[in-house]
């Protein structure tokens, strides 16, 4: 993958919300962190909500990204960005790891964010193990989905959100295999995350103390 945020192939700096979903150890966070590194290198402002801080095969979040670790910090940051009003010349990209913590079914006070925050040039990058744990009003605001290995029920839900049927959700995905879905389009792109970023998926991983 070239280190260009404007790469058509990766859609890294698309001014839309994006969802990365897959069960643990499949590569979703590895891919998200690669995209965050590209955005930081391209001088975009990048925020990250990550309450766990687990290293992936591709390392941690890039230097230059502002890391938030509590829901309180997340919501305060969103309020500040909303108050600033946004600048079309300087979009902000906000990665939300453990997305169900913020956008779960019970988190009704946060559901507005996916609908309205793009109006101030803030674009979400939501990461989740189980798409069905995200509220539908949040999932369906995502124009692109990087779908890695999921349970059949989760795959069916996310494919339905994006207008795809069994021809996609029945696809067998191994570790790192990813399908890129685009809302409103029948086109799909399939690739392997670990081959794309050139890392060993079985490398040791660390959890921050």
Feature map (PLM): residue ranges:
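A structural signal for isolated positions on well-ordered beta-strands in alpha/beta enzyme cores
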Residues: 47, 123-125, 179
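Conserved P-loop NTPase motor module
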Residues: 1-22, 31, 40, 44, ...
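Short secondary-structure boundary/capping segments
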Residues: 10, 136, 170-171
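Conserved C-terminal "switch" segment of AAA+ ATPases
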Residues: 166-175
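Flexible, charged surface loops at secondary-structure boundaries
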Residues: 11-14, 40-43, 60-62, 81-90, ...
